[in-house]
């Protein structure tokens, strides 16, 4: 099985760590992961039709376009795509309900 994943986080270190964790988890389940990364919501939305992303993992707090605003556009453009929000800030938990999404995960709990 192949899973096309879009990962967006404005922190390059977090982007790399999350990408590695996704690769590890997919490897454990024998899922081939094709991961595309962006460091801004604006960059992601410019390239949204370039790839057939099945799962987006979005940081919430980013400059210009937040992960929540990006998710609203993803919901319109690719309604079958699934979305997981990640954040270091619990204060954004209730904001994710403005969009269709699967989960909200705190970055500190990613490995669990």
Predicted regions and their residues:
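CheY-like receiver
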Residues: 46-112
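Conserved sequence signature across two-component system core domains
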Residues: 8-9, 38-40, 56
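Generic anion/oxyanion-binding catalytic loop in active/binding sites
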Residues: 7, 33, 45, 59
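Helix N-cap/capping motif at the beta->alpha junctions
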Residues: 37-43, 67
């Amino acid at each position: 099985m192949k899973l096309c994943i879009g990962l967006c986080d404005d922190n390059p270190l977090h982007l790399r760590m999350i990408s590695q964790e996704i690769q590890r988890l997919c490897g454990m389940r024998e899922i081939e992961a094709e991961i595309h990364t962006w460091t801004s919501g604006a960059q992601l939305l410019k390239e949204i039709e370039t790839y057939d992303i099945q799962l987006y993992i979005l940081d919430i707090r980013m400059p210009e376009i937040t992960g929540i605003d990006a998710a609203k556009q993803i919901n319109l453009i690719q309604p079958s795509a699934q979305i997981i929000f990640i954040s270091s800030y619990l204060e954004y938990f209730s904001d994710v309900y403005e969009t269709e999404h699967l989960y909200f995960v705190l970055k500190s709990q990613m490995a669990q």
